[in-house]
Regions:
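Short Cys/His-rich zinc-binding micro-motifs
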Residues: 8-19
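Long, intrinsically disordered low-complexity tandem-repeat segments
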Residues: 48-85
Length: 362
C-alpha cells in the first residue's frame, strides 16, 4: 500500500511498511530509559572495588524484592547478548541495593485526567470513565468542578497547543458537553456524578520512568534517549546505556482494552548527576511536576500499587544491578580467562564470572 505521494506507508508504532499507526496490530509502544546512579562508598563507607566482596552473593534477595517471577515484565529468553561497547567504570562493581538510586519523574497530570480531557473514552462506558476519575488527584477533581472546558484545556497544554492536539479539541469538547448535560446518551450519568463518585485517594500524580512514543522512522534507542533528555533535562552524554542488555518490557492491557508496551533501556549516570525542574524546558513545564533520585524502598512506594507491571520493571532493574557486575574489558578478561587485553569492551557478567550468553535473573 502506498501513500498519496507515492511513498510506501510507514507505521510509526512498529516501524514497518504497509500500514499506518491507526491500523497497527502491535501493542502501542513507548520507549524510555531507567537511569541509575551509585552513591559513593560501600556499606561501611569504603569505595566499591573489584574483589571477593564484589563477586559475593547479591545483597538484595528475593525477600526484599518479592517473588522471583517477573510476571509480564520480562527480560526475554536471552536477556544478555554478547558484549558490545560500553563505557562504565569500576564504580558500578559490587553494588548493594542501598547504594543504588533510580531516577523517577512525576507527571504534571494523572493519566486518568489527561485521557478524560483529551476525550479518549467511550461515552457509553461508565466503568472505564469511573476508572479515569478514580486515578485523578483531589486537585484535578476540584479543577473539573470549578473551571470550564476551555480553561481546563489551555492549562493542560500549558497554553502551548500544537496542531496535533487542536484536532482533538472538538471531539473532547463534544463528549465533555454531553456529560455535563447528562441524558440518554450518557445513560443518565453526568460529569458531576462522576466527580462525586470518585474515590479521591490520590493527592499527587503518578511517578514513573521517562518514556514516550517514537517519531516517524526514529529508531528505538534514539527515541528512548530523546524522551529521556526532554523529560529529565539531562544531556544524552550524561547517561551511558548498558548496551549488552536487552531492554526491559512492561506489557499490559489498558482499561480501554488497548494493549500497551513500554520498553526501557538501562543506563548509568555518574554519582554526582543532579536533576531538577528546569523552568526553561518547555517539555518539563508541560508534562513533569517533579523529578528525583530514589533508593529502591522509596521508589517502589512512589509507584501506585495498581501499576503492577511498572513495579515489576523496577524489581527487575534492581535484580540486574545486584546480581550482575559491569566490568571494564581488561578486568573482565582477567576474571574469566586470566588474561588482560587493551581496548576490550566493558562486560556485564554475573557474580560467578560467567560470560557470553548469560541469562538475566529469573
Amino acid at each position: 500500500m502506498g501513500s498519496g505521494s507515492g511513498q510506501p506507508t510507514h507505521c510509526s508504532n512498529c516501524n514497518k511498511l504497509g500500514h499506518y499507526f491507526r491500523e497497527c496490530k502491535e501493542p502501542v509502544t513507548s520507549y524510555g530509559i531507567i537511569a541509575y546512579r551509585v552513591k559513593p562508598g560501600g556499606p561501611n563507607g569504603a569505595s566499591a572495588t573489584l574483589g571477593s566482596a564484589a563477586l559475593g552473593p547479591a545483597a538484595l534477595g528475593s525477600a526484599a524484592l518479592g517473588p522471583a517471577t517477573l510476571g509480564s515484565a520480562t527480560l526475554g529468553s536471552a536477556a544478555l547478548e554478547p558484549a558490545v561497547l560500553n563505557n562504565i567504570g569500576l564504580t558500578t562493581c559490587g553494588l548493594i541495593h542501598t547504594n543504588i538510586e533510580i531516577l523517577l519523574i512525576q507527571r504534571k497530570d494523572t493519566l486518568g485526567y489527561v485521557e478524560f480531557m483529551r476525550g479518549k473514552y467511550n461515552i457509553n462506558s461508565p466503568e472505564y470513565i469511573t476508572s479515569l476519575f478514580n486515578q485523578m488527584t483531589v486537585d484535578e477533581l476540584t479543577r473539573l468542578e470549578t473551571f470550564d472546558f476551555e480553561a481546563l484545556w489551555n492549562t493542560l497544554w500549558n497554553n502551548q497547543i500544537s496542531r496535533q492536539y487542536k484536532q482533538e479539541y472538538d471531539t473532547a469538547l463534544g463528549k465533555y458537553n454531553l456529560l455535563v448535560a447528562g441524558g440518554e446518551e450518557t445513560g443518565g450519568r453526568t460529569l458531576e456524578s462522576y466527580i462525586k463518585g470518585a474515590n479521591r485517594e490520590w493527592t499527587t500524580p503518578e511517578w514513573g520512568f521517562p518514556k514516550g512514543r517514537r517519531g516517524n522512522r526514529e529508531s528505538e534507542i534514539s527515541c528512548a534517549v530523546r524522551e529521556f533528555s526532554e523529560e529529565t533535562g539531562l544531556d544524552e552524554t550524561q547517561c551511558i546505556l548498558v548496551k549488552n542488555l536487552l531492554p526491559l518490557e512492561e506489557n499490559f492491557l489498558g482499561g480501554n482494552r488497548i494493549q500497551y508496551r513500554h520498553r526501557y533501556y538501562l543506563a548509568y549516570c555518574q554519582h554526582n548527576t543532579e536533576v531538577c525542574i528546569d523552568s526553561h524546558n518547555s517539555v518539563m513545564n508541560r508534562e513533569i511536576s517533579d523529578i528525583g533520585w530514589f533508593p529502591y524502598e522509596e521508589a517502589i512506594k512512589r509507584i501506585r500499587p495498581y501499576n503492577v507491571e511498572k513495579r515489576q520493571i523496577l524489581m527487575s532493574a534492581f535484580r540486574i544491578l545486584t546480581k550482575y557486575i559491569v566490568l571494564p574489558g581488561r578486568e573482565y578478561l582477567k576474571l574469566t580467562s586470566g588474561h588482560s587485553r587493551r581496548g576490550t569492551p566493558h562486560q556485564l557478567v554475573d557474580r560467578d564470572g560467567n560470560r557470553g550468553h548469560t541469562r538475566g535473573p529469573r
